[in-house]
A protein has these predicted regions:
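Long, charged low-complexity segments
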Residues: 3-22, 34-109
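Structural motif
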Residues: 21-29
């Protein structure tokens, strides 16, 4: 089953889900999530991966803020921020966005 073209995507999904389940989310999990969003957006024909962030009641301003945070966690050039532990609300943000994303797009194992 892991030899399918989507084996990589499922592997990344499992890594992120395990980090959420074990409450050990780190900055690099946001990078992995962005990678998953980018690949899914490309597959589904979206121009922007941020369009896949579909939390009910989320405003455009919230979406832009989430995208900025994911970008900063993914492309961080400041070493001080690399080592900085995530706050509980940042860990919860990944959980909210990831679980909404996997639910909305009907991801299966």
């Amino acid at each position: 089953q892991n030899d399918t073209p989507f084996g990589y995507h499922l592997f990344i999904k499992r890594i992120i889900q395990k980090a959420i389940d074990d409450n050990v989310v780190e900055r690099y999990h946001f990078m992995l999530f962005r990678n998953l969003l980018e690949k899914t957006a490309s597959f589904l024909g979206y121009n922007n991966w941020g369009d896949l962030l579909l939390v009910e009641g989320m405003s455009d301003e919230d979406r832009k803020g989430y995208i900025r945070f994911i970008n900063s966690a993914s492309h961080n050039k400041v070493s001080d921020l690399e080592a900085k532990e995530l706050k509980p609300n940042e860990k919860n943000l990944l959980k909210l966005l990831f679980e909404t994303f996997t639910g909305e797009y009907k991801w299966k194992e």
